């Protein structure tokens, strides 16, 4: 009986081991084998439900019952094996990486912002290029013994770890879900504490956290909508719609704004009051103040991605973009991002003058920045954004002819000169140029609603669609609807440019249409060339202006035309280039003279002495030849008939041959 019981226990243990191995294999496929950490409350309760549901399903498949003693023994053995595996993995980590992690953790613990900034912006990228350019960094569980399992640092480390996976590698479904869990842990740590957390991070890192959080939300939304290449495990994960949902992302950003009271601080600053008086306990801390401020810019971006351009601009009611001393200028990437999305929102709202002004301002800033900012790890990303803004600027200028800065005009012509010339012509060629630049330069739009992964029948029906809904194509159609209206009026403009006054009957005969149809066409044309232009106040405020270089008024049956051509400012051109030449000369004069070695100096001196000797010798030989030839013929005396006919009373020749007073030379 004892032997039978022992054999039965061994068979049960083997079955349980097989069950555990199968369960771990499935979890690695679904979640990457990472364990949940921390007991903080999650922003979305559904995050923890995924693991629990699948664990229950796996246990049900095995159907094995194990008593508590055996389960405890197996758990202890599993923990020991896991510790041994982690120790082996830690031993494989290079010494330079381990030292970096220890020093990085020490800087975070003592809130040394300067050391954190150096470790984050400089050392991390250098070590990545050296050790992990095409592979993952060590997992947080591997380096946990080096930092005494400090969850605060491990959460920050995981944020960098997943960002590296997104930027250098290709994230899979489990990476996307685990990254969301980690962001939930971080934001719960910041938002749900009884008081301000004892953590200080550089402004650049805080902006990157918000920026990366929105980027991963955007990436997940696009990945989620591609239902054709999803496995069954990924579909099971995606049935939980709370992960990376629009509601959860917006909830985080609005919560950070509310917690930091950044809106109240900005209002107080605009009135000349002290922002610290209204900041409160949390808003007075740099961590909360900067996270709240960057969340405003983040909401601008999210609302543009969702296609709500009016609400996007509404988010910046209390931010002065043109203020040089504002918080927006502390981080270059934040500054560029804000202007990019503001300019694009203006473009989609048909406010072309404001769009051109926004893009011109930030492109001039980037142009001046390039000579100082090449060391930044974000330099390439800023340049890519600048190229996209040049494309959007060329579209806005094609729809609203405007005088631009000479440097911006030159750059835009060099990059998109061919497309710009096409966009000014009506027809399919012009529309194709607009479409090409829009697809290239627009943001990666997302949809708030996901496919029905929870409904199998609806999902099958969704997969059978020939064309899946694409938010980018939808926004393109919205934009091109206005472009088509403006391009269709090109024929009317060509006739109006030839006259200052023209009868409607005559113009209708030119176009071969009725007068009523002509008046309707001209009213559509006039409306399409009217737009708001910001002058002060909120970004949504503005005055109605004409966006075309041609304007007209219809008085009964007569059309009065006024054309305003964009002229070139020659005075500004000369002033700008004169100042540039002056700066170049000052720069050249300020540079030190080149240091020449002693050997080169000696060689140059010897060559100069040799050249001087040769020159002196040549002069001496010429002098000797002149003396040997004798005096000039006109100074020689000869008797008789052969005597010279030179006038004796004439003055003697100058120089050594005659008077000491210099005289004009005479031909010998």
Swiss-Prot record:
Biased composition (Low complexity): 18-32, 648-662
Biological process according to GO: formation of cytoplasmic translation initiation complex; translational initiation
Region annotated Disordered, chain positions: 1-42, 625-668
InterPro entries found in the cross-reference section: eIF3l, PCI_dom
Protein biosynthesis listed as a keyword: yes
Subunit structure, interactors included: Component of the eukaryotic translation initiation factor 3 (eIF-3) complex.
Entry's family note: Belongs to the eIF-3 subunit L family.
Chain's role: Component of the eukaryotic translation initiation factor 3 (eIF-3) complex, which is involved in protein synthesis of a specialized repertoire of mRNAs and, together with other initiation factors, stimulates binding of mRNA and methionyl-tRNAi to the 40S ribosome. The eIF-3 complex specifically targets and initiates translation of a subset of mRNAs involved in cell proliferation.
Name of the protein described by the UniProt record: Eukaryotic translation initiation factor 3 subunit L
Record organism: Mycosarcoma maydis (Corn smut fungus)
């Amino acid at each position: 009986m004892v032997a039978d019981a022992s054999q039965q226990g061994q068979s049960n243990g083997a079955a349980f081991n097989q069950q555990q191995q199968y369960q771990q294999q499935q979890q690695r496929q679904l979640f990457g084998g990472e364990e949940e950490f921390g007991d903080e409350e999650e922003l979305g309760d559904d995050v923890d439900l995924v693991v629990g549901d699948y664990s229950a399903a796996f246990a049900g498949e095995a159907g094995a019952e194990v008593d508590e003693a055996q389960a405890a023994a197996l758990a202890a053995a599993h923990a020991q094996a896991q510790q041994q595996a982690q120790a082996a993995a830690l031993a494989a980590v290079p010494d330079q990486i381990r030292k970096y992690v220890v020093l990085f953790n020490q800087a975070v613990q003592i809130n040394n912002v300067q050391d954190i900034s150096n470790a984050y912006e400089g050392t991390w990228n250098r070590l990545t290029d050296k050790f992990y350019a095409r592979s993952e960094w060590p997992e947080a569980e591997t380096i946990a013994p080096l930092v005494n399992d400090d969850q605060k640092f491990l959460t920050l480390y995981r944020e960098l770890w997943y960002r590296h996976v997104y930027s250098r590698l290709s994230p899979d479904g489990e990476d996307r879900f685990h990254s969301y869990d980690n962001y939930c842990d971080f934001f719960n740590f910041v938002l749900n504490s009884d008081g301000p957390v004892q953590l200080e991070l550089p402004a650049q890192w805080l902006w990157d956290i918000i920026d990366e959080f929105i980027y991963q939300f955007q990436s997940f939304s696009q990945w989620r909508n591609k239902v054709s290449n999803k496995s069954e495990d990924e579909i099971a994960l995606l049935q939980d719609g709370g992960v990376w949902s629009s509601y959860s992302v917006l909830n985080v950003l609005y919560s950070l704004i509310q917690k930091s009271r950044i809106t109240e601080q900005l209002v107080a600053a605009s009135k000349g009051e002290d922002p610290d008086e209204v900041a409160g306990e949390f808003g007075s801390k740099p961590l909360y103040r900067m996270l709240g401020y960057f969340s405003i810019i983040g909401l601008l971006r999210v609302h543009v991605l969702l296609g709500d351009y009016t609400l996007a601009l509404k988010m910046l009611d209390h931010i002065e973009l043109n203020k040089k001393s504002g918080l927006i200028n502390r981080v270059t990437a934040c500054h560029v991002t804000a202007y990019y999305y503001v300019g694009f929102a203006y473009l989609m709202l048909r406010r072309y003058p404001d769009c051109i002004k926004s893009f011109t301002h930030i492109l001039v800033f980037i142009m001046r920045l390039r000579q100082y900012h090449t060391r930044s790890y974000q330099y390439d990303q800023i340049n890519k954004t600048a190229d996209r803004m040049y494309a959007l600027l060329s579209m806005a200028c094609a729809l609203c002819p405007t005088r631009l800065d000479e440097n911006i005009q030159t750059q835009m012509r060099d990059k998109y000169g061919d497309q710009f010339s096409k966009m000014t012509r009506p027809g399919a060629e012009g529309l194709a140029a607009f479409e090409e630049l829009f697809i290239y330069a627009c943001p990666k739009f997302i949809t708030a609603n996901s496919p029905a992964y929870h409904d199998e029948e609806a999902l099958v029906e969704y997969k059978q669609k020939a064309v899946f809904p694409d938010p980018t194509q939808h926004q393109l159609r919205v934009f091109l609807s206005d472009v088509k209206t403006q391009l269709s009026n090109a024929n009317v403009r060509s006739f109006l440019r030839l006259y200052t006054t023209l009868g409607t009957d005559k113009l209708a005969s030119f176009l071969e249409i009725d007068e009523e149809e002509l008046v309707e066409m001209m009213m559509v044309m006039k409306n399409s060339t009217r737009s708001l232009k910001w002058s002060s106040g909120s970004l949504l405020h503005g005055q109605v202006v004409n966006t075309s270089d041609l304007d007209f008024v219809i008085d009964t049956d007569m059309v009065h035309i006024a054309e305003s051509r964009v002229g070139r400012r020659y005075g500004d051109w000369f002033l700008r280039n004169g100042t540039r030449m002056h700066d170049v000369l000052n720069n050249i004069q300020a540079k030190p003279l080149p240091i020449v070695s002693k050997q080169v100096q000696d060689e140059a001196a010897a060559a100069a002495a040799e050249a001087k000797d040769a020159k002196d010798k040549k002069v001496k030989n010429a002098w000797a030849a002149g003396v040997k030839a004798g005096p000039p013929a006109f100074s020689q005396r000869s008797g008789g008939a052969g005597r010279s006919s030179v006038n004796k009373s004439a003055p003697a020749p100058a120089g050594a041959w005659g008077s000491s007073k210099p005289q004009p030379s005479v031909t010998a």
